[in-house]
UniProtKB/Swiss-Prot annotation:
Coiled coil: none annotated. Pfam families: Mycop_pep_DUF31 (PF01732). This is Uncharacterized lipoprotein MG068. It comes from Mycoplasma genitalium (strain ATCC 33530 / DSM 19775 / NCTC 10195 / G37). A lipid is attached at residue 24 (N-palmitoyl cysteine). The lineage of its organism: Bacteria, Bacillati, Mycoplasmatota, Mycoplasmoidales, Mycoplasmoidaceae. Belongs to the MG067/MG068/MG395 family. GO terms for cellular component: plasma membrane.
């Protein structure tokens, strides 16, 4: 009875709240005028700072079509190629994790199937096709020699337009075999709600042709430092804990919300002399933005850390009235209002999430990496709950999607999970049918090489799946 009461209490409170997804599609929103925040902004972490890992791995993403301009945050999760001796003829491929709602703006006719069409298997509307993409970072502009004649600032936001439009490596839709955390609850859901589900997680592929000047700048100044930091995390970089073991975690977050700012900000765009002829497998960029576009708009991707004068990191909101358990864990299956339209089809959110105290990051920060005390990747930030004028409900509640939820090993505590709630969006498990390691294996990326060399059998589930499929074919 107590669990039901808490669940109903949480649901009713959420009906009073608005979930703001923090990947944004807008031009100069007026409500962000005079931006103020308690968090530390526009400060590059030192090497000894715990946020330095987040900084090296994290980038601002910008997608544009004829109809909209979308910003989000992404972080390095994988790559393909030797960063120390890259191929000259083949692109170096970078894989960045972000939110699914951010890559709704990625619509590429040359994308991998099934992402080269919308979720209803229909061709994209020409006005929706992605024409522009850039990847940016708050950094030292002096590393780009051409900027020494343009800008005198020691630090600035620099965004670089790549030569081609990214592709979709992974989208977390319909990713589990069994939707059964609470069978009495799921039985009451409509058939459509049971079928089409999502987690707010995706991975994009950015091909970098290193003979292209801008692509090489992205590779050399952004990606290589990120790879070096990624390797330092080691094979245990992806957290997988029982849900009740998160209560003492502290989450470090660094992202790029789009807010009014006076910082120097520039776009290094593609120029005619940089363009090469690419194979039909890739989509060259057809739209460029003037180098001063961001600077003139004054709505600038702004480096932010969940660090204040009095605290570092975010902790779970351990409050019985504001979470479906007493441990700050959200069960999305019980919140049917958590929905997303991805590529013209509606999905219902599934899985588990973190309810984060005092973590109100603004739009543009969607996709922010959540790193725990042990320097492990625990989740991905995607939005904030807002209760309007009722500050007693703690309006600054951030929400993140947990990436890996193990099978429950404590049958006595029914408020945490049941044995059908497990999933693993990265490496897969017995209940996960759609996970990133499948793509990594098929394309022999760095992550799959790590899986192959690992002694941890839990990371090798993708090989079991492939063997099972081959055996069934025989």
């Amino acid at each position: 009875m107590l669990r039901r009461y808490l669940t109903l209490s949480f649901s009713s409170l959420l009906l009073l709240a608005l979930l703001f997804l923090t990947g944004c599609s807008f031009v100069r929103p007026q409500f962000r005028r005079g931006f103020r925040t308690q968090f530390k902004i526009n400060s590059i972490p030192t090497v000894s700072d715990p946020y330095h890992i987040n900084y090296d791995l994290t980038f601002s993403l910008n997608f544009a079509s004829n109809k909209r301009n979308t910003y989000g945050t992404g972080w390095l999760i994988d790559w393909k190629g030797d960063e120390n001796n890259p191929e000259k003829n083949d692109p170096f491929k970078v894989y960045l994790a972000t939110n699914l709602h951010v890559i709704d703006a990625l619509r590429n006719n040359n994308d991998y199937e099934p992402y080269n069409k919308d979720s209803n298997n229909q061709a994209f509307n020409s006005e929706e096709i992605t024409r522009f993409f850039s990847i940016g970072k708050y950094t030292y502009p002096s590393i780009f020699s051409e900027l020494n004649f343009i800008i005198n600032a020691r630090e600035a936001f620099v965004s670089i337009q790549t030569s081609t439009i990214p592709k979709t490596a992974y989208a977390a839709v319909n990713f589990v075999e069994t939707q059964g955390e609470d069978e009495s609850y799921t039985d009451s859901l409509s058939t459509d709600n049971k079928r089409d589900i999502y987690a707010d997680f995706a991975v994009i592929e950015i091909p970098l042709f290193l003979t292209n000047h801008r692509d090489y700048q992205v590779f050399n100044e952004f990606i290589k430092p990120a790879i070096e930091t990624y390797k330092q995390l080691g094979n245990s970089s992806f957290e997988k804990k029982q849900l009740d073991q998160h209560k003492n975690d502290n989450f470090y977050m660094l992202g790029y919300p789009l807010v009014e700012s006076s910082i120097d900000a520039l776009i290094l765009n593609q120029r005619r002399q940089y363009n090469n002829s690419y194979t039909e497998k890739y989509t060259p960029q057809t739209l460029t933005k003037d180098q001063r576009t961001i600077d003139l708009s004054r709505e600038v991707p702004t480096l932010i850390q969940n660090k204040t004068e009095n605290s570092t990191g975010s902790q779970l909101l351990v409050n019985q009235s504001l979470s479906s358990t007493s441990e700050g864990i959200i069960e999305f299956i019980k919140l049917p209002e958590f929905k997303l339209n991805y590529h013209n089809k509606s999905y219902r959110q599934y899985g588990r999430g973190f309810a984060l105290q005092n973590t109100n990051f603004r739009p543009g920060s969607s996709g922010t990496l959540m790193l725990n005390n042990q320097k492990q990747i625990a989740g991905i930030y995607f939005g904030v709950l807002d209760f309007g004028e009722d500050v007693s409900l703690m309006s600054n509640i951030g929400v993140g999607q947990i990436l890996r939820v193990p099978q429950k090993n404590n049958t006595r505590n029914r408020s945490i999970a049941t044995n059908k709630s497990n999933y693993d969006l990265i490496f897969g498990d017995s209940n996960t049918t759609n996970f990133y390691a499948k793509f990594a294996r098929q394309n022999n990326t760095h992550l799959y090489q790590m899986i192959s060399n690992s002694k941890d059998t839990k990371l090798k589930y993708v090989n079991t799946v492939e063997k099972t499929v081959k055996a069934s074919i025989k």
